[in-house]
């Protein structure tokens, strides 16, 4: 089992980062809330990983800290929530925001996430709330807002296309993803900024 990777970022294609360690390039799927905090390509990064084996694929999911990974593992134990949906949930809101939404039973915030209907949101609140009681020490200390670094490289159409592709990968329908990006698009924004702003606007 691969639990942690330390290496050089070769490529960032939201929501996937290609990380080289020991001469091997690992494709790691990351929630966008974690992806925003990665350094630029060519720099070193450390990610905590969860390895998922399926019949048709072997996938690595990466996180900036163990707490985010713990939450991801708990999410995929929930009936009807697989790794892809868990990734979408933690892209739409930070791990701390999700914990807060569950503990405050904010159904409205959860159903705005892609792939989450009312029944799934209710199930998440019921199942995750119980698990948080035993996990609190392992999860989060008092809430701290994430400081998101502004990504470099300004682009325009390419950035918009990348942002749409990333939102589709997170579970949004292509037309919906295009609409979300066009609403907040601006010429100097990078794809990461567009994704972040589109997800914020959706909530």
From Swiss-Prot:
Residues 156-203 are annotated as: Domain III. The keyword DNA damage applies. GO terms for molecular function: ATP binding; four-way junction DNA binding; four-way junction helicase activity. SUPFAM superfamilies: DNA helicase RuvA subunit, C-terminal domain, Nucleic acid-binding proteins, RuvA domain 2-like. It holds the Pfam family RuvA_C. Gene3D superfamilies: 5' to 3' exonuclease, C-terminal subdomain (1.10.150.20), DNA helicase RuvA subunit, C-terminal domain (1.10.8.10), Nucleic acid-binding proteins (2.40.50.140). The keyword DNA repair applies. One of its GO terms (biological process) is DNA recombination. Residues 65-142 are annotated as: Domain II. It is found in: Cytoplasm. It comes from the Bacteria. Residues 143-154 are annotated as: Flexible linker. Residues 1-64 are annotated as: Domain I. InterPro entries: DNA_helicase_Holl-junc_RuvA_I, Hlx-hairpin-Hlx_DNA-bd_motif, NA-bd_OB-fold, RuvA, RuvA_2-like, RuvA_C, RuvA_C_sf. One of its GO terms (cellular component) is Holliday junction helicase complex. Its main location: cytoplasm. Keywords: Cytoplasm, DNA damage, DNA recombination, DNA repair, DNA-binding. Forms a double-tetrameric structure around Holliday junction DNA (HJ); the DNA is nearly flattened between the 2 tetramers. Each domain III contacts a single RuvB subunit, 2 on each side of the HJ; forms an RuvA(8)-RuvB(12)-Holliday junction (HJ) complex which drives branch migration. In the full resolvosome a probable DNA-RuvA(4)-RuvB(12)-RuvC(2) complex forms which resolves the HJ. Has three domains with a flexible linker between the domains II and III, and assumes an 'L' shape. In the assembled complex, domain III contacts 2 of the RuvB subunits. Belongs to the RuvA family. The RuvA-RuvB-RuvC complex processes Holliday junction (HJ) DNA during genetic recombination and DNA repair, while the RuvA-RuvB complex plays an important role in the rescue of blocked DNA replication forks via replication fork reversal (RFR). RuvA specifically binds to HJ cruciform DNA, conferring on it an open structure. The RuvB hexamer acts as an ATP-dependent pump, pulling dsDNA into and through the RuvAB complex. HJ branch migration allows RuvC to scan DNA until it finds its consensus sequence, where it cleaves and resolves the cruciform DNA. In complex with Holliday junction (HJ) DNA, endogenous RuvB or RuvB from S.thermophilus and ATP catalyzes branch migration. Binding of domain III of RuvA to a single subunit of the RuvB hexamer activates the RuvB ATPase 2 subunits away and nucleotide exchange in the adjacent RuvB subunit. This is Holliday junction branch migration complex subunit RuvA. It comes from Salmonella typhimurium (strain LT2 / SGSC1412 / ATCC 700720). The gene is ruvA.
């Amino acid at each position: 089992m691969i639990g942690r990777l330390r290496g050089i970022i070769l490529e960032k294609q939201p929501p996937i980062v290609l990380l080289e360690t020991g001469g091997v390039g690992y494709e790691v799927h990351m929630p966008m809330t974690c992806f925003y905090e990665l350094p630029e390509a060519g720099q070193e990064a450390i990610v905590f990983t969860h390895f998922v084996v399926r019949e048709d694929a072997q996938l690595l999911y990466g996180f900036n800290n163990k707490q985010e990974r713990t939450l991801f593992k708990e999410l995929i134990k929930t009936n009807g929530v697989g790794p892809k949906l868990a990734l979408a949930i933690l892209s739409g809101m930070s791990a701390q925001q999700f914990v807060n939404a569950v503990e405050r039973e904010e159904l409205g915030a959860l159903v705005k996430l892609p792939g989450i209907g009312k029944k799934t949101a209710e199930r998440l609140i019921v199942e995750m709330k119980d698990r948080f009681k035993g996990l609190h020490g392992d999860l989060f200390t008092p809430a701290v807002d994430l400081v998101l670094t502004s990504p470099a490289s300004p682009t325009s159409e390419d950035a918009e296309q990348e942002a749409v592709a990333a939102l589709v990968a997170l579970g949004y329908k292509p037309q919906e993803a295009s609409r979300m990006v066009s609403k907040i698009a601006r010429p100097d924004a990078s794809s990461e900024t567009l994704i972040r702003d589109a997800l914020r606007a959706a909530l």
